[in-house]
Curated annotation (Swiss-Prot):
NAD(+) binds at residues 173-174, 252-254, 278, 301-304. Its EC number is 1.1.1.26, 1.1.1.79, 1.1.1.81. PROSITE patterns: D_2_HYDROXYACID_DH_1 (PS00065), D_2_HYDROXYACID_DH_2 (PS00670), D_2_HYDROXYACID_DH_3 (PS00671). Belongs to the D-isomer specific 2-hydroxyacid dehydrogenase family. Present with 3280 molecules/cell in log phase SD medium. It comes from Saccharomyces cerevisiae (strain ATCC 204508 / S288c) (Baker's yeast). InterPro entries: D-isomer_2-hydroxyacid_DH, D-isomer_2_OHA_DH_cat_dom, D-isomer_DH_CS, D-isomer_DH_CS1, D-isomer_DH_NAD-bd, NAD(P)-bd_dom_sf. This is Glyoxylate reductase 1. Glyoxylate reductase that reversibly reduces glyoxylate to glycolate, or alternatively hydroxypyruvate to D-glycerate, using either NADPH or NADH as a cosubstrate. Does not act as a hydroxyisocaproate dehydrogenase even though it also has minor activity on alpha-ketoisocaproate.
Length: 350
């Protein structure tokens, strides 16, 4: 068995070489081939002759799901008893079912704070673009419709921020960053809906309303909730029908929070006037009909796709792994495990 604790690094990073180099001074960092399948992975972590069966800390990126599949109950049960922590490179961790890891006393960590600014910037870009029909104008410009199609390439008029009610679905870290970024543009009316009302000092002047009222009052629906069994298809045909005619929807959270077919139908009918989307329900597979709609301003999940943010995320994942080795505990344990006693009983690996 290795003298150093074994850290399994799943997925590639872009800016973390220096941090990983430092970790290798105290850990044996191993990887798996790019061609690895879930079946191979599940088989090899159970093989006592394979180094994977001795792993103690796992780090993972979202893209590594192509090799391992979801971190679900089957995978959690297959992992060797030596595993004490899974460290995910992202704020959203819907690829991980926390409960089976909780049952095995395996800590799960994410990177909750570092993505807020970059994601909020992306959200505001999409919101303003969808409100002003910039996506339509961009498409028509590229298609060569100017000047023949008239002013603005014949794009429909957009709308200004004044007088519009922005409904923030999920006023958490990212939601508050979006709120503060929107105020200088002239937005004045903000409402929000969370499962529970926040303390007034955390509301930043945003009015708490019930879900039904939220749907009825919002001119713009800003989606910022994590994806879980409670929020899957939270926006669906029934809830869309309760929204204002001509509502604008912006989503930089997770695609499956919205029933994509219901949204597509509503865009086609005009119930939803436009949408700004950085995430999609079945990404990277995207509905051809949705992509063909000029009123959809879409991005290929670029919310945290900046040098500075990505570097910080990758470095924090390494810090989580390092902290497990030196103290037994991750730095940023996910909310579902924050009230558990057993992580505090974890021992250093060296």
């Amino acid at each position: 068995m290795s003298k150093k604790p074994i850290v399994l690094k799943l997925g590639k990073d872009a800016f973390g070489d220096q941090a990983w180099g430092e970790l290798e001074k105290i850990a044996d960092v191993i990887t798996i081939p790019e061609s690895t399948t879930r079946e191979q992975f599940l088989r090899e972590v159970k093989d006592p002759q394979n180094k994977l069966s001795q792993v103690q800390v796992i780090t993972r990126t979202a893209r590594s799901v192509k090799n391992t599949g979801r971190f679900d109950e089957e995978l959690a049960l297959a992992l060797p008893s030596s595993v004490v922590a899974v460290c995910h490179t992202g704020a959203g961790y819907d690829q991980i079912d926390v409960e089976p890891f909780k049952k095995r006393h395996i800590q799960v960590a994410n990177v909750p704070d570092l993505v807020s600014n970059a994601t909020a910037d992306t959200h505001v870009f999409l919101l303003l673009g969808a409100l002003r029909n910039f996506g339509i104008g961009n498409r028509r410009l590229i298609e060569g419709n100017w000047p023949e199609a008239g002013p603005a390439c014949g794009s429909p008029f957009g709308y200004d921020p004044e007088g519009k009610t922005v409904g923030i679905l999920g006023l958490g870290r990212i939601g508050r960053c979006i709120l503060e970024r929107l105020k200088p543009f002239g937005f004045e009316n903000f409402i929000y809906h969370n499962r529970h009302q926040l303390p007034s000092e955390e509301e930043h002047g945003c009015e708490y309303v019930g879900f039904e009222e939220f749907l009825k009052r919002s001119d713009i629906v800003s989606v910022n909730v994590p994806l879980n069994h409670n929020t899957h298809h939270l926006i669906n045909a029934e809830t869309i029908e309760k929204m204002k005619d001509g509502v604008v929807i912006v989503n930089t959270a997770r695609g499956a929070v919205i029933d994509e077919q219901a949204m597509t139908d509503a865009l086609r009918s005009g119930k939803i006037r436009s949408a700004g989307l950085d995430v999609f329900e079945y990404e990277p597979k995207i509905s051809k009909e949705l992509l063909s709609m000029s009123q959809v301003l879409g991005l290929p999940h670029m919310g945290t796709h900046s040098v500075e943010t990505r570097k910080k995320m990758e470095e924090l994942v390494v810090e989580n792994a390092k902290n497990v080795i030196l103290t037994g505990k991750v730095l940023t344990i996910v909310p579902e495990l924050q009230n558990e006693d057993w992580p505090n009983e974890s021992k250093p690996l060296v």
